[in-house]
Amino acid sequence: GFSADGLHAGFKKRKMDFGWIVSEKPASVAGVYTTNKVIAAPLIVTKTSVKKAGKMRAIVVNSGVANSCTGTQGLEDAYTMQEWTAEKLGVEPDMIGVASTGIIGELLPMDTLKNGLSKLVVNGNANDFAKAILTTDTATKTIAVTETFGRDVVTMAGVAKGSGMI
């Protein structure tokens, strides 16, 4: 199954701003990506891993700092975010997706990231993850549906952010 957690790490002044979704085992993954000419560092890292591995164990997300338009340092920081998360979960880096949302042009405060990562737990609070990925949104967007297929009971869940600025 999957679990999630979210917390306040310090990317923002007061609100939750860091979280992850973790799978017990490698899960098939696909991506839909921007067609913009400017592509943020976390997207480059995640897109590369999705193409290489086709499976992931987790995605880790910070909000408040987008790590977009940050050049070589931003890309290095996104790979470091992936590596640190992989180390914490005991998996290969390509099993980790990374995402950042927030202010464009700012580098990730890596001490804040490392401290926040040390506090994330597997089997944390999924609602806190939904709060942690918000930027200008006014409400969380989540859904879960359980269906029975023969003898198997399957729960599908989703969490999203966005449209607050549109």
Residue ranges and their predicted role:
Residues 60-89:
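Alpha-helical support elements that line or immediately flank enzyme active sites
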Residues 1-38:
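N-terminal amphipathic/basic leader segments beginning at the initiator methionine
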Residues 57-64, 95-101:
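Glycine- and acidic-rich phosphate- and metal-coordinating loops
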Residues 79-80, 84-166:
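Glycine-rich, mobile lid/loop segments that gate access to catalytic sites or pores
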Residues 25, 48, 64-66, 101-103:
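Short, ordered loop/turn segments at secondary-structure junctions
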Residues 35-44, 72-80:
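Glycine-rich anion/phosphate-binding loops
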